[in-house]
Structure formats: structure tokens, C-alpha cells
């Protein structure tokens, strides 16, 4: 009995210790508050004043704290109110309890923490719920705005809302919605400054949210402590029950022995007594089971409550995180608005300074009245607070009395239980065995519950520690932000002061400048008037001299301008002379260059002669001295190179003796840097730069060729096989300049691509050492840039070509000491340069015949020297005395070149009509190929014996019609019918040349090609006349009987396609159509009559199409120059009538031209 009482006393002591711990926690909070108030310099109070009174010192401290926060808010509201609200929202939270938790604790009748903020008067549950509902409704009535904004509310309404208790009783979600609405209004209105009353309301709402979060955290800690106390209490009760069970089992054993001893005395009485004991035992068992059920139920309720508290805590933490995130977002937006506001405030600062003095007295009087009203309101608030505290004190006293009465009743119950123990021991002894059986199960269940509770406690403790660490971190960040804000505010204040001073000085300076400008303006007007009078007098006195000087200079300038215009219209070859500087080891004291003028004059002095006879004067477009840099050389020719992008053909070549610096001028030194680049690299770089600048209007495509002429053979320097591959030259009257179809064409997109290709070509170029130059160029190199531009707006196509020619130097064999291969190379070089001199002489004499075909070099330069191109020649001169003869020869050659008139160059433009015309021609070419394939297939089907002969005839037709690069001169194709079988026999004479002898044919016909100026319209008319004649002849005669499906339509289509191919070749090929076609047929009348019907029914679509194309070509491409004869014979005379003999034998002979007419036309063309 004594042990059970001791256990109960220990359980009550544990419960009391839990209450004491909660009270101690509350005292610890009060102590921290007093320490913080003392650091802030606020009046303090004693912790006992909260319990015993008086509370006046407490009210004084709270009022002082409020005044200090209000003063801080008023002072910093205009500049950084959002930051203050953010920092105040992150302050250390005060510990209060949540109303929902208070209600749940009231139901469990657990002693409350004295630090809780709710009233402790004994109110019923219904009363509390009605108050809560009323508070929620009042909050919605106050904060729910139907129309308008929070910023439009008056200050009195905001003050009423803040003083009411609706904030304390409002749901947390409603408070969050209020914060979001206020911030959204600020963002939508873009107001940088928050009104003071609205800021106070926002601050109070945020503080209320933080108070609830901190209250919930404190409540969870208190619940943990209470759970520990309850666990100790339950354990003590279990121990008491176990002790009671053990004592009852012993007593039951004793009673059973006594009962056995007395059984013989009174059986009925024993039975009755056993029934009574059994009933008592059952009652005790039910009570014990009830106690166990209550313990389990209490345990489950505690676990449920802890789970609910944990969920509430998580929800509150999530709400706080949302608030912090929203505040950060709003803070960034308000920061941007504040920056704008600062700019506005700077402009409005001057106006506010003016009104500040007048409004100061009014503000002081209003301030005094506001302070009086404020003090009166604070007095009323203090009285209300005192009344509330008194009510709370009375409530605490009444609760204390109730607790004491409850304690007395508990003591009585304990005594009653002790008295009842003796009577229960006998009954408990009977239940010992049953309890022993159930003990294991209950103990297992209790252990599980204890394990769960321990795990839950560990999790909660770990979470609390994490929250404490986060809270410390938040405090640290708040302090850092406060320091940063303070430093920045000081910096901005200093900047504002300096800016105001600067603005004041600038205003003063502007005023001074205005006054000065007015005075200066008057002085300038006066001076202008005086000067105008003086100038008029001076002009009259110097009129004669001025007129004479102006006439002289104007005449001189006009003569120069007219001379340049005449040179441009004549198309003379521009000649620039560059003098090579002396090399190391040469005698620099003696030179052959006597004088270099600024206008292109150069005097060459003969060291062997004195006086005027030893001096020769030359005049060129420009003379560049030895000190001229590569950049200066390029700037002289830069406008000429840029005309390539406008559709002109430009050729620049360097001429001079070996070792005079031609390769240095055109390419630059080996491994040259950008500063030492030659004309080639600089020109290409400039072209790409301009094309990129015009890419919005014109789209350019650039491709590069690089060849060399070595020993009268053309080699591709950019091909895979290096310089071993030999190439042929086509007619040089192409729109793009050079026409070397087998040379590799590389498309390029940047100057770096071209530089890489040129380096490859220079590595493949033939270079050798001679006595005059260690790296002497042994071949003529030609770099050609083909540029095609399309105007994105008009669709006009521009085609230009830039030819950069580096000629090999002329040399004397006795000086260069060339032998073997070098001697052979020198001979070819001198021969080609001699041929170039002959061409220049013929052009200067304006001879009708120019010997372009004498050398491959002149064939390459044919388009530049005698075609539609702007041409410039660099003459490289060696100033050494020993090279006087070569220098004189070079300058004489350059003088002859400068007198060559090429005619004005024209841009290569193609309109949309020409483009469509070429597309139609390409379609006609495709049709030719299809017809040829069909002919070959039909011939293979119909001719079995003469298969090879028919195949050869078909290939000749295909070659002459579709190959644009091979000419077949004077070919004769005769179709004869044999007497026995009617088979086709084809006899071809002077067939077209193949690819192997391609270069030889180019040599034979280069001269004829150079004089070719026949327009495409004349050729198309002759071709159409030929096709009409052929078709008319074939319409009256029978066709081949072995070609049943090749009727009028096919024959007309084939001839029209062949004529189209001749039209499409234009200036590229010289096809001879002087041939005799003899068509024979078998005497098969049925097939002939059927074929004639098909001829009458055949459509004339190809003929009409060809006529339409020819008509369009005549409108677009008719030149103004007189037409010259061509290799095509004119077919204006009708063919001779057929004889009866030819009719009877079925043989038809169509004579297109005689050999005499062909020879006469060819002779006219070459001359």
C-alpha cells in the first residue's frame, strides 16, 4: 500500500515539474525581452510585476517600444519602406499560443503555460467557438473590399482595423490574402512610395503571422515536455498496477487455503461467499480493463494530437516561406520603383525646398496637436490594458482556487483508494493468472507505442533544432542586411548632397553662359557687319587678280578632268610603274632612275651617255617610288578592283624583267604577314569585305581558279594532280573572262579560304633559281575570281571576273646563265612575252588582225587586252645600272601598252527576261538529249545489220547538238539509200574533234574566236531557216520505212532541238551545219501514206515554241554593232527541185550550203 502511494506521489510530482518547466520557459522569454529592452534604452520592469502587479511599469515599457518603432517607420518610410517591412517581418518571433491548440488543450484539462496570450477565464467551449466565428466574420467585414483599393482607405479606417481584435482572431489564409492584395495593388499602380497607414497595416498583419508561427513552435515544444511527463505518469501507473496484481495474487492464494480449511464448516455459506468474491473479482477485472483501455486511448489521443500539431507546424512554416518569397519578389519590384522615385524626387527636390520653409510652422502645430491626441489615445489604451490585466488576474485566481479544490479531491480519492485496497487484494489475487497471460501482450503493445513515441520525439527534436538553426541564420542575415542598408543609405545621402550642389553650380553656370552668349551675339553681329563692308571693299580691289587666278586653275583642272574622261571612254590600259628598291649587295650610289614626278613622269638616265641624249622621259598613270609600301600600291588600284562587284571584268598583270619584284607586288614575300600582303591578297580581302557589307541588297557567290602557263602548257594549280594536268583554252569571249573549263573551280566564302587556295597554288607553281634571282618564277600564273551577284530587289544578275596575272620575267640567257630546263623555260617565257609585244603593237596600230593565237599567254589575256574589261598593268623596274637595257625595253613596252584603246568597259548584267530565256534553252537541251536517246533506241530496234554505222551517226548528231565546248567544222553527213535493201549509209567527213586534240583545235580557232561578234539573233534566224527547210523537204518526201514511229512530229522536234542547241551555244562553239542529208525509203506505199497522214496531223508545238524563244531573244539581245558573217551558212534560197530520177528511186538530197560559200564566210570571219 505504501509503495502504491509513493508511486502516485511521484506521478503528481512529475506533472507539477512539467508545469514548472513551462513556467520557467515563460520566465526565460520575459528575461530575454527585458535584456533586449535594456539594450535599446527603454524603461524596464520586474518579472514579478506580471504575476503580482502593478502593471503600470509594463505598460510604460510597451508604449515606449511602440513609439520607437513608429518613429523609425516615419523616418525611413519614403526611402526604403519595403526593406523595413521585410526586416521587421524577419525579427525574432514572440512566443504565444494558437487558439486552436488552446481549445484542444482545454478539452484535455492540461495545465496551461502562463506565457499564453489567450484569456484564462473559465469559458465554455460553445462560448469560445461563437467568439471565434464572430471574430472571423468581423475580420471579413473589415478587410473584404467590394470596390476600391486598400490604398484608397482613410487613415481612420486603417487605425480602427489595427486596434480591433479581428487580426488576432482572423484565419492565417485571410492574412496572407490581405498581404498579397496590398502588394499587388502597389505593383499595378507602380507607386514607388507606400502610404504610411497602409505600411502600418501591412506590418501589423506580417507581425501577426510571425506571432502565430512562433506560438505554434513554442506550443510544440510544450507538448513535447507534456508528452514526456505523461509517459512518466503512465509508466508509474503501470508499475502500481503490476504491484497490485502481485499483491492480489498472494492474497488470493492465502484466501484459497483458508477457504479449503473452512470448507467443512458451512458449504452453503462458502458457496455464497465464493459467488460474492467472484462478482467482486469480475468488477475489479472490469475496472482494470477499463483503466487499460483509458490508458491506451489517452496514448492514441496524444499521438493524434502530436501528428496534428506537426501538420499545423508544417503548414505554418510553408505559409512563412510563401510570405518570405512574396516579400522578396515585391521587394525587387519596389526597389525598381524606388529607383524611379529617386529620380523623380531629385527633380522635385528643388520645389520641395521652396515650400519647406512655408510649411514648417503649419507642420509643427499639426504635429503638436497629433501628439496630444496620440497621448490621449495611449492613455485610453493603457486603461483598457489595465482592465484586461485585472480581468486576467481574477481569472487566474479563480483557476488557482479550482486547481486547489481539485487537488484536495484527488487527495481524498487517494485515501479512499488506499482503504479500498485491502478489500480489492483478495479479488486481484484471483485475476493474477489472467493478468500474467495478458501481461506479455500488453507489454509488447506498450513497447511498440513507446518506440513510436520515441521516434516521433526524436523527429520533432531534430526538426526543432533545424528550425533554431534557420532562425539563427535568419537573424544573422537580418543584421547583415541592416548594416548594408545603413551604409547604402549614407552613401545615397552623400550622393544626393553632392548632386544638389552640382546642379546648383550648373544652373549658375548656365545663367552666366546665357548672359555671355547674348553679349557675344551682339559683338558677332557687329563684327559681321563691319567685316562684310571690309570684304566688299577688298573684293573690288582684288577682282582682277582673282579672276585671272581662277581662270588659270579652272582651265588646268578642266583639262585634267577631260583627259581622264577621254582615257576612261577610250578604255586605255592603265599603266602603273613601280621602282624596286635596291637589294643588299647592290650599288645604291648609282641608279638609272633620274626623276620621279607626282603626275606619272619618269626620267630614265643612261649611265653611258651624258646630256639630253642620255635621258628619256616616260609618262604613265602613276609612278611608285622605291619607298612605296604595299598598302599605298593597293590604294591606287582599289577603285578599279571594287568595280568587279558592279559586274565589270578587271585584269591586273605585272610585267618586267626577272628579279624586278613582280611576284612581290602581286603576292608578297613568302610567309607574308597582313602588312606585307600583295595585290592578290588585299584585293580578295577587300572584295569579301564589300560583299559582306552589301549582303542585305545583293547576294554574291565567289569562286576561284588558279592556273599557270609553263612551257606553253596550261596547268591547273588547284587540281588534285598538281601542275601535271594539261588544259585547253576555249574561245575567250565568255562573260566571265577566262574560259578554261577543265580547270578546277573552288567556291569560297571568306578571304581565309582564298588565301589557303592561293598558298596551295603557289606551292604547285614552277619556281627555279637563276643567276639573277634565287626564286625566279618560271611560269605565268593567273588567279581568276568569278563573282556572280543577284540583286535581291530587282532580280538582276551581275557577273564580274577579276584576273590577277603574275607574268614570268624576261631575261637574257647570257646574264641568267640558264642551261638545260632553265634554258628551255627561258626560251618559252621570252617567246610568250614577245608574242605579247606583238599583240600590243597590233592593238596600238589598230590593225584588223591581232595575232592572239601565237602564244597561250596572249590567248589567256585576249579578253583583257581586246575584250570588255578594265585592264591595269604594273611595270616593275630594276634601278640597277647593270639592268639599264632591260629597264629601257620594259618602259618602252609599257609606253606602247598605255596607248592601247580597248573601248569603254560595260557591266555584265542579265535581266529577268534573259534569265527566263536561258532556262527555256536549258529545257530545250534536255529535250534534245531525250530525243537522241529515243532515236538510238529506235535505230537499235529497226537496224540489225548496220548497227555500228547508225550508232556512229547518232553519236555525231548528239555531239554536234549538245556539247557546248567542241566545234565541228565543215562536217558532212550523207544518208544514202542502197539499191537493194533501202538501208541507211552514213558517210562522215571532217568529224568533230574529241577531247584529246582539244587544245590543238583551240589554237587553230582562237584567232577566229577573237573576232567573233555575231549576235545570237542572226544565228537563231539561220537555225530556224535551216529547220524550216529541212522539215519542208521531209514533208514532201517519204521517210525511212524502217522507222515506223518516227514521223513528222519527231523529225520536226529533233531538228528544232538541234537548232536550239546551236542557239544555246552562242559564242562558245562554232558548229557547222553544212551537211548533205540523203533520205531513202522502200517502195512501201501503205506505210508512206500512213506516215504522211501523221505528218499532216502532227502538232506544231515545238516549232511555235522555238519561234517564241527566238523572238524574245531578238528583243533582248540585239546588239547595236554591225553584224559580222558567221560560220553558219544562210539558207534563204529555196532548195533545188527534185529530178524525176531522184523521185523514182526515192532518194532525196538536201543541200544546205556549198563548200565555197562556207570557205568564203570563214575567210571573212578570220580577217
UniProtKB/Swiss-Prot annotation:
GO molecular function: ATP binding; microtubule binding; microtubule motor activity
Alphabetic keyword roster: ATP-binding, Coiled coil, Microtubule, Motor protein, Nucleotide-binding
Biological process according to GO: microtubule-based movement; microtubule-based process
Chain ranges of the Kinesin motor domain: 572-900
Record flagged with keyword Endoplasmic reticulum: no
One CC-aspect GO term: microtubule cytoskeleton
SUPFAM superfamilies from the UniProt entry: P-loop containing nucleoside triphosphate hydrolases
Biased segments, Polar residues type: 1113-1124, 1151-1167
UniProt keyword Cytoplasm present: no
Stretch list, region Disordered: 93-130, 955-974, 1083-1167
Pfam families given in the database record: Kinesin
UniProt: ATP binding residues: 656-663
Coiled coil, from the record: 271-333, 366-398, 432-489, 907-944
Compositional bias annotation for Low complexity: 117-130, 958-972
Entry's family note: Belongs to the TRAFAC class myosin-kinesin ATPase superfamily. Kinesin family. KIN-14 subfamily.
Name listed for the protein in its UniProt record: Kinesin-like protein KIN-14M
Organism for this UniProt entry: Oryza sativa subsp. japonica (Rice)
